[in-house]
Design a protein with these regions (language model features):
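Secretory targeting and sorting signals
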Residues: 1-17
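C-terminal His-loop and adjacent cap/lid subdomain of alpha/beta-hydrolase
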Residues: 18-123, 128-454
Length: 454
């Protein structure tokens, strides 16, 4: 009889407690459709540990996914987790309007299939899906016990649109003032793709001169672009030229294309443009950037007048936001910081698509809401968007589980503790969690140079 009544308490007791009730269905992959038009996929492990991981995928194809990648899926199943995730229902690839509801609907469908109530459910979000999961942490609906965000877009769409506008405006206005490349209010995906291609061409050509490189570095500072994009170690702190080359590579290898084509999809979802730069003080933005020294050095070497460029940018900035689009994204695609369940966030220290500075802005929101005790953030010493090892992700999930077991964070999210847990999985990798304090989100709402209220 003990097995039949083992509920949430089972996971809190000693290891010899009754094992979790097993599902009504055999191990394997399952799929289904939701009323919203979304579909879902799930995996049941050989021996279920009682926990469901509700996975929220990133920006891109609206296809159901239930894990970050195949090796991580296999390890999670090996550890006994049941996995489920939805495709989201679109039509925009920026699916925040429907994603939270689609995720809960997928969870409900999976629970019906299992025929057993999970002892615990953890929302695990990646990139844009990290914003989905962070919103679930504020709206757990009695279903979600904890949240793990990975490379999460946790500063939300309003900030993303604003600081990316600062960056592309700087590139277009200083490098190609006569070209009139459209930066907001795209009429079609094709128009956005052409604008992205035009910006890539301008940046590629400008990289050939010291003046061009200095201005690309300035735009990169506004984009919160890391100075480390590829390789196992970053350029030396004073090697400003090498840092700039890494920023350039990130921009032309896909960064600019993602920023511009992604904006078109967000505009489609929001019904307009949420970004503004009219009234933004570009000198204050640069002064707040961790890369200000690099930019100033490259301007000096090029013999360029940085003050003049900053004055030009501030004077000519004239993009105003559409109030309806701002209201729409405020509702669907921003966080309040009002966490209702524990959350662990992990991020690489150098992320060219969702800068690690998102975590600084997010932590301030959570602190302002009085919920800092529920949030922990941990950082991986590597470059690239979502470039985590499977062991690093599983160790983070296990740390969150221990937080839910004990009710306390203690040192669970400390780098040394996470590294030891990851390496104990013996997956043939060495974990890279490191002490790190992210810089401010340059151009973020309420940061220097841009008002909190638009």
């Amino acid at each position: 009889g003990a097995v039949a009544v083992a509920g949430g308490a089972a996971s809190m007791t000693a290891a010899n407690a009754a094992p979790p009730v097993q599902p009504d269905v055999p191990p394997g992959e399952y799929r289904g459709d939701l009323a919203s038009g979304a579909d879902w996929m799930a995996h049941v492990p050989q021996e279920w540990n009682g926990t469901v991981v509700l996975f929220a995928h990133g920006f891109g194809q609206l296809a159901a996914q239930d894990a970050p990648d195949e090796p991580t899926r296999q390890e999670l199943l090996e550890q006994g987790y049941a996995l489920v995730g939805s495709s989201y229902s679109g039509p925009s690839l920026w699916a925040l309007e429907s994603a939270v509801d689609d995720q809960y609907a997928a969870l409900e469908a999976f629970e019906e299939l299992l025929g057993v109530e999970p002892e615990r459910t953890i929302a695990l979000g990646r990139s844009m899906g990290g914003l989905v999961s962070a919103r679930q942490a504020e709206d757990p609906r009695g279903e979600i016990d904890g949240v793990l965000t990975t490379c999460g877009l946790v500063a939300g769409a309003l900030n993303l649109n604003d600081y990316q506008l600062d960056g592309v405006y700087t590139l277009s206005h200083l490098l190609a003032p006569d070209q009139d490349i459209p930066l907001v209010r795209y009429e079609s995906p094709e128009q956005a793709a052409q604008a992205a291609a035009d910006l890539v061409a301008v940046v590629t050509e400008s990289q050939g001169t010291p003046e061009g490189r200095a201005r690309i570095a300035l735009a990169s500072a506004f984009l919160n672009m890391p100075t480390w994009y590829s390789g196992d170690v970053p350029p030396a702190p004073q090697d400003h030229q090498a840092q700039q080359v890494q920023q350039y590579e990130a921009l032309v290898a896909g960064g600019l294309e993602r920023y511009v084509t992604g904006r078109q999809q967000i505009e489609l979802a929001a019904g307009g443009n949420s970004a503004y730069n009219a009234g933004v003080d570009y000198r204050a933005l640069l002064d707040s950037s961790a890369h200000a020294d690099q930019v100033r050095a490259l301007y000096r070497e090029a013999g360029l007048d940085l003050d003049a460029d900053l004055a030009t940018l501030t004077r000519d900035a004239d993009v105003e936001a559409d109030p309806e689009a701002v209201a729409d994204l405020t509702r669907s695609s921003m966080v309040t910081g009002e966490l209702a369940v524990p959350e662990l966030a992990i991020h690489t220290v150098a992320d060219e698509l969702v800068p690690v500075e998102h975590e600084d802005w997010y932590a301030e929101q959570v602190a302002r809401a009085g919920e800092a005790g529920l949030l922990r953030q941990a950082y991986v010493d590597g470059a690239g968007h979502c470039e985590f090892q499977p062991a690093e992700q599983v160790a983070a999930l296990q740390a969150l589980e221990q937080r839910l077991d004990t009710g306390r964070w203690d040192d669970l999210a400390d780098p040394a503790r996470l590294n030891a847990a990851a390496d104990a999985l013996e997956l043939g990798t060495t974990a890279r969690f490191t002490p790190f304090d992210p810089a401010r989100l340059v151009g973020g709402l309420g940061e220097p140079g841009r008002d909190r209220d638009r």
